[in-house]
Structures are given as C-alpha cells and as structure tokens.
C-alpha cells in the first residue's frame, strides 16, 4: 500500500530519512504515527527507525544528544526540529515483566518490527509513502481489530504493561480485541502486579479519557485485569456501577473528573488514601477530593457563595457534570451567578492584610490574627462586608469589642 501524500509532520522529517539513506543505511517512519495517518487521526510524535547503529547515526548528523543510546536512541537536532532516531533492535529475555535483559542492535527491519506489541503498531513507512506491513496490520485496521504481533502470550509475558496498553488502544481507537489476544491478556493479567503503579496509572488514565472509554472499561472488567490494579481487587460490581450510573454518551472533561466519578461509584470513603495507592501527585489528590466533596455536598443541599469561594468554579462545574451524567438535577446558571456575585475569589484579594492590622489596630501576630482574617474573609464572601479598608477596620474593631 502506498499513501497518496505524506502529512506535514512526515514531510518535515523527510530530510532526516534521506540523509540516513544517503549514508548507506535504511530508515523508516514507524509506530503509532503511521497507524494514525492510516486512520486519518492527528499525528503526535514521529518516530524514526534505522539500520544505522547509534555511533553511525551520530556520524551522519552534526548535532545529536544521547537520550537513550543504550537502547539505540539518538536525538537529532536538525533545522530547528528534534527527531528521535532508534536503531533496529531485538530484545533478550525480559526482567520484571517490563524491561528486556539485553538489547541487541540489528540491521533487519523485520527483526525490529517483530518485537512490537500489536499489529497496528508494527507498520513502517518509507520516504516514498509505501507502507510496510509484515504482520497483516492493514487487515486488522480494516476490521477494527487489535491483535498481538506473533504469539500473544509471549508479548504479554515479556511486558505486562502491554495488557493495559491494549485496553487503552481499544478505548481510543474503538477496536475490538482479537480473541486469542484477549485470552492471553486474561491469562497474564496477574503480571500487572509486577508493573510500576505509575505506569499502570498513566494507561488507565488515558483509557478513562478516551472517546470509547466504555469499551475499554468493559474489556478491563471482562479480562479481570482490574483485580491486579491498586484498590480494585474484587470490585467488579462497583466498576460495573461506574458504567451503568453514567449517561452512555458521557465523556470526561478531565482526569480529575474521571477519577472522582470512579471513586464515587466505588463508594470510597477516603479519596486521598485511594489515590495515594496509585502514587498520584498531592495536587491531583486535592482536586479529585474536592470534586468528590462537592458532589457529596450537593446530595445534601444547594450551592452557596461559600462553596463557590472554597472550591472554585472549575471544581464545582466538574462535580455538577457528574451529576448531569447521572441524570440528576443540575444548575450551571446558578454556579455562574454565584461566582459573578463573589467580591473576592482569593484571600490575597482582600485589601487589608496582617501588616495593616498590626499597623492600624496594634493587633499582634498569632492565632488571634489568623482568626480575625478568617472572619473578614468569610464576611466579604457572604456579602456582609465590603472589601474596603475603612469598612474592614470598623468590622475588626466591632469584632474585638464583642
């Protein structure tokens, strides 16, 4: 198969391929970028594979950086662009079900493509737009099938993260997982316990944000892979509820909203504890916890200015989005109205600070100072006090007298 045209992302990198070929070596575009152009999807990273060994690649180009030379990757800096060039390679027995014990550089494109995970990721594209398809990936693209390259059991035993990648690709591409490949996923699902939590989180997070995330979640459940992910063991009913509770066309706006929705469906009591098991950042934990908190507040009462001030409009709208997806009453207009009525959105917007209170009223630093500023803040938020120095100082004097 030959492409009628090369997208601009490939066009920019063509001089790199031609330079390598001029030096007497083979060079191809490989990986997900080739798959995406065949599916008419946006292209992100353009990867180049070559028969030249790393030291040979470095001799071809003037400016290079060793970004992963032990794995055959050299970063080439050329005409304002950066290109990762990786030598064809084979891999020895994997350790920890993730990393090869040894990488061997080879001159054969076929040997290199054999080690890829799925047939639709095992294409190569030459400078003339010809697609090299050694594993019937084009047929799988046409049939919307995700199939492992070679023996599926070997691929997942080599690198168990491929199980999560497969589920994620199913969710992003709307592909069914080929039967033998799926059975191998189920067989090797327990190996996910050997994979770093951070890597599993990245793949699961991408799955949740994918346009066909429901397909990916169903495959996650059917494969029993969830049993080997943090905090999800034996939670099939809750994961199924996660799907059934949301409108079938609902797409998550953010990672934070997706994980908040999952946590709500699983009836997790302590959000931060749950997310710490996934080794997420404290900032992420805080935002997810706030979305969950707002959702639970909304189960008890309507929104107030104080809620808007404390959590912020972005967090509250995401919680309201989950309510809408669950078929509950929502009021986005009220959120906008309350937000517009707030005199301040942050404590730093108060015209008086601790220094002013020390200078004008002689209040000493300490717990009392913090309490006074909190009272000022609340009164302004509730509309009981205008954000002007004279009014605030009068308020403080009255507060101290009471």
From Swiss-Prot:
Necessary cofactors: Mg(2+)
DNA-binding listed as a keyword: no
Binding-site residues, ATP: 32, 35, 116, 159, 162, 165, 168
Binding locations of Mg(2+): 45, 47
Keywords of this entry: ATP-binding, Magnesium, Metal-binding, Nucleotide-binding, Nucleotidyltransferase, RNA repair, RNA-binding, Transferase, tRNA processing
Keyword hit for Iron-sulfur: no
Gene Ontology process terms (BP): RNA repair; tRNA 3'-terminal CCA addition
CDD domains to which the protein is assigned, alphabetical: NT_ClassII-CCAase (cd05398)
Record-linked HAMAP family: CCA_bact_type3
Homology family: Belongs to the tRNA nucleotidyltransferase/poly(A) polymerase family. Bacterial CCA-adding enzyme type 3 subfamily.
Function recorded in the entry: Catalyzes the addition and repair of the essential 3'-terminal CCA sequence in tRNAs without using a nucleic acid template. Adds these three nucleotides in the order of C, C, and A to the tRNA nucleotide-73, using CTP and ATP as substrates and producing inorganic pyrophosphate. tRNA 3'-terminal CCA addition is required both for tRNA processing and repair. Also involved in tRNA surveillance by mediating tandem CCA addition to generate a CCACCA at the 3' terminus of unstable tRNAs. While stable tRNAs receive only 3'-terminal CCA, unstable tRNAs are marked with CCACCA and rapidly degraded.
Assembly behavior: Homodimer.
Protein's UniProt name: CCA-adding enzyme
Organism annotation: Streptococcus agalactiae serotype V (strain ATCC BAA-611 / 2603 V/R)
């Amino acid at each position: 198969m030959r492409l009628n045209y090369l997208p601009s992302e490939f066009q920019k990198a063509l001089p790199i391929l031609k330079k390598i070929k001029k030096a007497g070596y083979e060079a191809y575009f490989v990986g997900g970028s080739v798959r995406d152009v065949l599916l008419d999807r946006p292209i992100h990273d353009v990867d180049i594979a070559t028969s030249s060994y790393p030291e040979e690649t470095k001799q071809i180009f003037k400016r290079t950086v060793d970004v992963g030379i032990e794995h055959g990757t050299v970063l080439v800096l050329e005409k304002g662009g950066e290109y990762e060039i990786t030598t064809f390679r084979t891999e020895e027995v994997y350790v920890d079900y993730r990393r090869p014990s040894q990488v061997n550089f080879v001159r054969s494109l076929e040997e290199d493509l054999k080690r890829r995970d799925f047939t639709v990721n095992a294409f190569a594209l030459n400078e003339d737009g010809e697609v090299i398809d050694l594993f019937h990936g084009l047929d799988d693209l046409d049939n919307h099938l995700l199939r492992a390259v070679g023996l599926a059991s070997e691929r997942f035993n080599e690198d168990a993260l491929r199980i999560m990648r497969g589920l994620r690709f199913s969710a992003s591409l709307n592909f069914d997982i080929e039967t033998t490949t799926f059975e191998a996923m189920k067989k090797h699902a327990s190996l996910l316990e050997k994979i770093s939590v951070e890597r599993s989180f990245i793949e699961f997070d991408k799955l949740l944000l994918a346009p066909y995330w429901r397909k990916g979640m169903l495959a996650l459940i059917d494969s029993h892979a969830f049993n080997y992910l943090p905090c999800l063991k034996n939670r099939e009913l809750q994961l199924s509820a996660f799907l059934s509770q949301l409108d079938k066309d609902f797409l998550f706006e953010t990672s934070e909203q997706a994980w908040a929705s999952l946590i709500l469906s699983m009836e997790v009591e302590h959000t931060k504890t749950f997310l710490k098991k996934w080794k997420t950042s404290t900032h992420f934990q805080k935002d997810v916890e706030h979305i969950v908190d707002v959702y639970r507040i909304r189960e008890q009462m309507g929104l107030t200015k104080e809620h808007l001030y404390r959590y912020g409009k972005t967090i509250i709208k995401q919680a309201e989005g989950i309510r809408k997806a669950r078929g509950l009453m929502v009021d986005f207009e009220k959120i906008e109205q309350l937000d517009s009525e707030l005199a301040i959105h942050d404590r730093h917007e108060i015209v008086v600070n601790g220094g002013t209170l020390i200078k004008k009223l002689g209040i000493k630093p300490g717990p009392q100072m913090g309490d006074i500023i909190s009272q000022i803040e609340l009164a302004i938020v509730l509309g009981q006090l205008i954000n002007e120095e004279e009014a605030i100082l009068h308020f403080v004097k009255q507060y101290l007298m009471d």
